[in-house]
Swiss-Prot record:
First-listed, main subcellular location of the protein, grouped into a coarse class: host cell
Origin superkingdom: Viruses
Binding site for Mg(2+): E132, D167
Record's keyword annotation contains Magnesium: yes
SUPFAM superfamilies: Nudix
Role of this protein: Decapping enzyme that remove the protective 5'-cap from both host and viral mRNAs to commit transcripts for decay by the cellular exonuclease XRN1. Preferentially targets spliced mRNAs and since all viral genes are intronless, it preferentially targets host over viral transcripts. Acceleration of the turnover of cellular transcripts promotes the shutoff of host protein synthesis and therefore diminish the magnitude of antiviral response.
Residue numbers binding Mn(2+): E145
Active site per UniProt: E141 (nucleophile)
Motif position, Nudix box: 126-147
EC code(s) of this entry: 3.1.3.-
Keywords (A to Z) from UniProt: Host mitochondrion, Hydrolase, Magnesium, Manganese, Metal-binding
Organism (species): Vaccinia virus (strain Copenhagen) (VACV)
Stated name of the protein: mRNA-decapping protein OPG122
Ranges in a coiled coil: none
Length: 248
């Protein structure tokens, strides 16, 4: 387990009862450690993302396709030119075709690579802004990324899932808190109102009963955990995100 990489896991364990056994999900670029806790005392942390695993009324899991790959974002972000070039030359398969073309022109480097078109998927959410609590952060991020008002979103706050994400390509660790929720819209209705934006290129919908990949494994763990008894919780069973925002 990567618990020693976490900045908040000791506080979470101290104040929240573990609800389910930890699992590890991994693919060729990420290793994710997930642990479910009864929500007894949770607070926003400026370095920890808050995300929602949301089910539609036609029983589909909402997932967002990022506009930029994780690797491209890291190459743009880092100021070290040697690191930029090293990441590009060694891992260009983890970029989209457009990103490879842009960086090839920028660096005047043309690495031998397969003709794949990388797309990284995430659940809607992000890092809370200063002064935001969990409901406010989720409301803002879901609206910005998916264009869904919080009146259509219902969150199960009886429990949460702490995730430690190791990106083995850029050699960094990230933390996230997942909540399970529902959207009172069908997948088609969500597609009709969605607007591509600077962060999210498009949406995909997963079948919760079958699939593969990291996003499916995360969702399966979360949905299985939602069936457990959350004794001692201080949350709500699918409360309106709008009401949670107003109450807090």
């Amino acid at each position: 387990m990567n618990f020693y990489r976490s900045s908040i896991i000791s506080q979470i364990i101290k104040y929240n009862r573990r609800l389910a056994k930890s699992i590890i999900c991994e693919d060729d670029s990420q290793i994710i450690t997930l642990t479910a806790f009864v929500n007894q005392c949770l607070w926003c942390h400026k370095r920890v993302s808050v995300s929602a695993i949301l089910l539609t009324t036609d029983n589909k899991i909402l997932v967002c396709n990022r506009r930029d790959s994780f690797l491209y974002s890291e190459i743009i972000r880092t100021r070290n030119m040697f690191r930029k070039k090293r990441l590009f030359l060694n891992y260009s398969n983890y970029l989209s075709k457009q990103e490879r073309s842009i960086l090839s022109s920028f660096f005047s480097l043309y690495p031998a690579t397969a003709d794949n078109d990388r797309i990284d998927a995430i659940y809607p959410g992000g890092i809370p802004k200063r002064g935001e609590n969990v409901p406010e952060c989720l409301s803002r991020e879901i609206k910005e990324e998916v264009n869904i008002d919080n009146s259509f979103v219902f969150i199960d706050t009886r429990f949460f899932i702490h995730g430690i994400i190791e990106d083995t390509i850029i050699n960094k660790f990230f933390e996230v808190i997942f909540f399970v929720g529902r959207i009172s819209l069908t997948s088609d209705q969500i597609i009709d109102t969605f607007k591509s934006n600077h962060e999210i290129k498009d949406l995909i919908f997963l079948d919760p009963n079958s699939g593969n990949g990291l996003q499916y494994e995360i969702a399966k763990y979360a949905l299985d955990t939602a069936k457990l008894k959350c004794y001692g919780h201080r949350g709500c069973y699918y409360e309106s995100l709008k009401k949670l925002t107003e109450d807090d």
